[in-house]
Amino acid sequence: MAKRTAPLLLLTLAVGLAGGSQGDREPVYRDCVLRCEERNCSGDALKHFRSRQPIYMSLAGWTCRDDCKYECMWFTVGLYLQEGHRVPQFHGKWPFSRFLFIQEPASAVASLLNGLASLVMLCRYRASVPASSPMYHTCMAFAWVSLNAWFWSTVFHTRDTDLTEKMDYFCASAVILHSVYLCCVRTVGLQHPSVASAFGALLLLLLTGHISYLSLVHFDYGYNMMANVAIGLVNLAWWLVWCLRNRQRLPHTRRCMVVVVLLQGLSLLELLDFPPLFWVLDAHAIWHISTIPVHTLFFRFLEDDSLYLLKESGAMFKLD
């Protein structure tokens, strides 16, 4: 349902990331980066670096300065481990072992698999549900919004830049808001389309304001997390209440309830903040991996519910 719905306790983690991390504040790290740039990132040394840099690295946007940061990160980590200290974070992230040009291999692959799961279920929904179903177009729009979010999540975990970070965060917010809209259409909009239209316009206005503030005023990690958590909790509560009220009449709502509970439970994985296993697999990657089957469950619910609504609307048409 919502791509990044997390408990309120995560707010403290998000705020902590905004001010930098222990690793990148270390004088040894900063001095290492400075010396590396002076030695390798200007004049003939820079030309030599570019000539020996693999083409896939340059196409992915890896610069000499980026390579200096990467090498100095591992140099600093090595010193920490030698002295028996805990592995530090750098720029709000744990140190990850780069694979080819992929910055966070496990999270990137998991995001890609989530996207593929969404694509498979989108195709299945499209093949099994006629376009005449009352929820067809709303569900298809939600599927495309989700697919777009997982695309940018894959790009962001492959290469972390200001642009890819913003696109990942903004598209995640769009999924959460669209899930709320989907719930509104299903629970209210089928009987009162004007209410759903007005509510959709309000959500679009909220998303526009959210993106404008983060882009033009201040990219506040704490505020972004707070906004997503607040909307995510509204989303989960709305779906859960509706499912509980209709579970006897609509047995397929049980899948939706399972998704709601799973999302809330799996989000707790984000609290297990630990250095990546084998420098690849951290809690965030495990969370991404664990959400893959959730797409299947939720789209199965959407498919069953859309077919039920189609059957119900057909029966009403015959009665008329």
UniProtKB/Swiss-Prot annotation:
Keywords: Glycoprotein, Golgi apparatus, GPI-anchor biosynthesis, Hydrolase, Membrane, Signal, Transmembrane, Transmembrane helix. InterPro entries: Per1-like. Residues 24-98, 157-169, 220-223, 279 are lumenal. GO terms for molecular function: hydrolase activity, acting on ester bonds. Its EC number is 3.1.1.-. Residues 120-135, 191-198, 245-257, 300-320 are cytoplasmic. One of its GO terms (biological process) is GPI anchor biosynthetic process. The chain crosses the membrane at residues 99-119, 136-156, 170-190, 199-219, 224-244, 258-278, 280-299. Involved in the fatty acid remodeling steps of GPI-anchor maturation where the unsaturated acyl chain at sn-2 of inositol phosphate is replaced by a saturated stearoyl chain. May catalyze the first step of the fatty acid remodeling, by removing the unsaturated acyl chain at sn-2 of inositol phosphate, generating a lyso-GPI intermediate. The fatty acid remodeling steps is critical for the integration of GPI-APs into lipid rafts. Belongs to the PGAP3 family. This is GPI-specific phospholipase A2-like PGAP3.
